[in-house]
Amino acid sequence: MRSVPNYHHSFFIFLILILFLAFSVSPNTLSATESLTISSNKTIISPSQIFELGFFNPASSSRWYLGIWYKIIPIRTYVWVANRDNPLSSSNGTLKISGNNLVIFDQSDRPVWSTNITGGDVRSPVAAELLDNGNFLLRDSNNRLLWQSFDFPTDTLLAEMKLGWDQKTGFNRILRSWKTTDDPSSGEFSTKLETSEFPEFYICSKESILYRSGPWNGMRFSSVPGTIQVDYMVYNFTASKEEVTYSYRINKTNLYSRLYLNSAGLLQRLTWFETTQSWKQLWYSPKDLCDNYKVCGNFGYCDSNSLPNCYCIKGFKPVNEQAWDLRDGSAGCMRKTRLSCDGRDGFTRLKRMKLPDTTATIVDREIGLKVCKERCLEDCNCTAFANADIRNGGSGCVIWTREILDMRNYAKGGQDLYVRLAAAELEDKRIKNEKIIGSSIGVSILLLLSFVIFHFWKRKQKRSITIQTPNVDQVRSQDSLINDVVVSRRGYTSKEKKSEYLELPLLELEALATATNNFSNDNKLGQGGFGIVYKGRLLDGKEIAVKRLSKMSSQGTDEFMNEVRLIAKLQHINLVRLLGCCVDKGEKMLIYEYLENLSLDSHLFDQTRSSNLNWQKRFDIINGIARGLLYLHQDSRCRIIHRDLKASNVLLDKNMTPKISDFGMARIFGREETEANTRRVVGTYGYMSPEYAMDGIFSMKSDVFSFGVLLLEIISGKRNKGFYNSNRDLNLLGFVWRHWKEGNELEIVDPINIDSLSSKFPTHEILRCIQIGLLCVQERAEDRPVMSSVMVMLGSETTAIPQPKRPGFCIGRSPLEADSSSSTQRDDECTVNQITLSVIDAR
């Protein structure tokens, strides 16, 4: 009799086998017998599926890396890369455990990266595990930690991750930026914690310090806005014999926030917003001129809320008076009177300060300010002192023993700093107070006497005087405009009808004539609609650019007023710096910092010079212009619309850092103001937005349009005014749009970019820039992004970019543009500031 198979028994055995396999190999671990290969597309996922580890190749690169990214977030965001400086050259790569180490092998079975653990029992089995906080661990069979990725950060600090020093081993955990947004290899920027008596963070470019966080004051790093206390974020700073580290913890579930050093050197706090499905920038550093390291030199401090930005501490004077007058405070300040160190020295208190660089400090956390002051007076090297901890009214003592530098004053926040002064400087203060009291009594008597005399004179008046007031619509002469700007030899400038004084040095006409070789043609740098720009050299050797306004231009005087009023208020690394002005003998001149590499258009559209603009330089220029425009629109004290952004108005310094210039057509907007209307359209055709050129409506989105045109010009090396098809009906915008629609947009890229990159051609990065440029030049203003969004898109390859709509002014040439082409000026200089348009739709 034939037996019947026991299907139930077979199924039971099969089920047991499946369960055994499921539990024996966890998806968040890698055992000694397992491996990850690129070809298998296998990854390791953390228990709650927050993070994922695996191989990736950025954009269209052929290089492969082992990395960790957010799995729970739809936008691919990398937080750690293992072999960032040793990528796999092909898709044949393997991660496995070899001995006590994690090792990546290439196609020839050669190791390209390893955890490099030495010693230990190689016979003890080890396993790797990915945790929900993003940490990748290697443990032995006794659960002893052998290695963790948190000790080797790349460009991102996650929650529970430590940044700083392990004092026992001397190992320093630092953040280092990607080289570019598409290249994970080590970039030039780093963020690291320097150990001193009073530790603080630096952002460095190679070995040069760019930014200093200020020391930990018990609650936060004194100049880092991101350490403001919020209920869901807990910050921790530890300074002990074992470690000097900074970390943070998130108390709210399903909240993802990271500290990120981008490829442009900005340290950003980014938080994921589920509602918008995007990373939002909560803060970044460095942000303004005063964040730049030691911008005001020794014994000088910076104040971004006033002008000039650099000031000497009371009792000090500038080392270089002329450079100081020209707003270059880097030489710093020196004492007016030397310290006596005989017990008679005293202190001046500076409020709301970022404490100075702490490289040379002595810290005692057990004493208060009174004893701290006494110790400072006992030490002839002591230059200043302050509380070490601001909590509970302040405690502890920190003493500076060398020149103090890199200070700034805040409108809110900061802490008190006590700077040592000679007794003579303190005596001057006492004498001044006595003089003030005596003068007040004398002035009161004088005012009373003056009132009596004035009253008597008024009664003697026999006739009234009629003052003729000119019509406000009359064109004012150039001489009358001198009264609009009050400039004294002490360097104070005020706007008409306002009591606001702006520090602006006044230079003599004779001095400028000497500096420019009597305005020689050999010194001529360029010519615009309002005058000529000359190169000059002052007696101290400082090079300057002198903009001499044309006497024949009625609008040149308006431009002069506008430029003085606006640029004097602006301080940013990507904006040209106004050093002074000249109002003398009917002449009006503006004095700027001299920028060695002249304007962007002189490089971009010149066949010889353009060869020096490889893609990395062009990308840096794009980012710099975007940062400058973002500052104008969002971060400056007054919102400013430039209205004439173009290649010839972007200047380049010796390091090819771009600086936006020419603010003669700019307008100030209120914080709640979104757009304005004008009957006098000014700007340059080819860069003007449709709504501005046709209807006189301008806004921040008008500048965004100009930026988009400029971005596409930088990528293509072509002017927007040319025609780029056989029918001569497509300008640059139409040319790029057609190639975008056809899917062959890389054909618009300047061949120099391709030649300079060879095998490292960052296709994905360039495509992103083209797409961002098209977003900026969309026909409808409401469709264009704001500059803060542009910066995020430029700085992160993981940010989703919308599909662009049709650009404005992409086909043909307008009649007005045709008319303007008859000018004898070059196309890029042919502005429409001499044209007045009638706008029917008044708003």
Curated annotation (Swiss-Prot):
Domain PAN: where?
341-422
Q: What are the entry keywords?
A: Abscisic acid signaling pathway, ATP-binding, Cell membrane, Disulfide bond, EGF-like domain, Glycoprotein, Kinase, Lectin, Membrane, Nucleotide-binding, Phosphoprotein, Receptor, Serine/threonine-protein kinase, Signal, Transferase, Transmembrane, Transmembrane helix
Task: Using the record's annotation, list all stretches that form the Bulb-type lectin domain.
Answer: 32-151
**Family the UniProt entry places it in:** Belongs to the protein kinase superfamily. Ser/Thr protein kinase family.
Q: Where in the cell is it found?
A: Cell membrane
Residue numbers on the Cytoplasmic membrane side: 457-843
Pfam families annotated for this entry? B_lectin (PF01453), DUF3403 (PF11883), DUF3660 (PF12398), PAN_2 (PF08276), PK_Tyr_Ser-Thr (PF07714), S_locus_glycop (PF00954)
- Provide the leader sequence positions: 1-31
Its tissue distribution reads: Mostly expressed in leaves, and, to a lower extent, in stems and flower buds.
All ranges on the Extracellular side of the membrane: 32-435
**Record's function text:** Involved in the regulation of cellular expansion and differentiation. Mediates subcellular relocalization of PUB9 from nucleus to plasma membrane in a protein-phosphorylation-dependent manner. May be involved in the abscisic acid-mediated signaling pathway, at least during germination.
Question: According to the UniProt entry, which residues carry Phosphothreonine?
Answer: 678
Which Cys-Cys disulfides exist here?
Answer: 290-302, 296-310, 372-397, 376-382
**Sites of glycosylation?**
41, 92, 116, 236, 251, 381
Q: Do you know which Gene3D superfamilies this protein is assigned to?
A: Bulb-type lectin domain, Phosphorylase Kinase, domain 1, Transferase(Phosphotransferase) domain 1
* Annotated positions binding ATP: 525-533, 547
> Which reaction(s) are listed as its catalytic activity?
L-seryl-[protein] + ATP = O-phospho-L-seryl-[protein] + ADP + H(+); L-threonyl-[protein] + ATP = O-phospho-L-threonyl-[protein] + ADP + H(+)
Give the transmembrane ranges. Answer: 436-456
Alphabetical list of InterPro entries matching this protein: Bulb-type_lectin_dom, Bulb-type_lectin_dom_sf, Kinase-like_dom_sf, Pan_app, Prot_kinase_dom, Protein_kinase_ATP_BS, S-locus_recpt_kinase, S-locus_recpt_kinase_C
Its Gene Ontology cellular component terms are:
nucleus; plasma membrane
* EC numbers: 2.7.11.1
Q: Indicate what this protein is called per its UniProt record.
A: Receptor-like serine/threonine-protein kinase SD1-7
